[in-house]
Amino acid sequence: MIETIDLTKKYGDFFALESLDLKLEQGDLFGFIGPNGAGKTTTIRILSTLLAPTWGEAYVCGHSIYTHPREIRRAIGYMPDIFGVYDDMRVIEYLEFFAAAYRIDGAERRRVAERSLELVDLTVKRDELVTSLSRGMTQRLGLARVLLHDPQVLLLDEPASGLDPRARIEMRGLLKRLQELGKTILVSSHILPELADICNRVGIIEYGRLLACGDVQDLLAQVRGRPVIRLRVVGPPEPAARSLEKCQEAAGVTVRDGEILVALADGVTDPSPLAARLIAEGHALTSMRESEVNLETAFLELTRGKLGRPS
């Protein structure tokens, strides 16, 4: 359903995307994982025919982005990370407006809009003003909009961004239901663990390069038995993280949600030198524990030593 071959986007000497080879089969729910600026949005915009690559090829539903962009636009539902709404419209009016933009026949617009609301469990809000919706409800409305023309492929850029924990759970459940309806879904996120439960395949991207791609369980299996240590200190964690980067026992160090994650070097099983280093340099260590293997630790392990921006 989606395939990219040597897909590259440059701005001057800067590679926003570099030699991306990616393939999604029909029915895949594919998680595109990476921090902000990794190349996720660039990839999605190219697949949506909104951005031309510097070189390389991409196909969606068998159509080339170069020769058949109209066919691709008919086949996809694209939801950007930020989208606008019309403040003075009711929810049902908003969807009928976009149904008209999709050139859906007038007699069908209300039925199609009602169907989309039902798919995203938003029917109860059909007569509410768009401005009255919560952030989570607004995200659902955006998803309902891209479902109006019954696309085969969904390209969703950070659909859970800014949502509270409950809304994130509801969004994950919604994406899983859409996959069960036969949709092929590419969903990007910089929050690594939230995709583990719903995606059958994931790709890890950083600095425009795809570093790992495969079944979730296969990626997790690659890092089982490799310890990742989580540490917390008093005060900002970044200075302590910089100290740990100098430890020969540390193969990779990152900071996430106020916590320091350290991938131990090959053959290292004892994390005590990490604590000793922090204490010696005056950092007040409050906790240290070995992390369970999940997508977050898989990301740290699979990218260690590979994350330097090319000069």
Task: Report residues per predicted region.
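Generic beta-strand hydrophobic packing signal
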Residues: I5-L7, V253, M288
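Conserved protein kinase catalytic domain
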Residues: R73, L117, L220, A275, ...
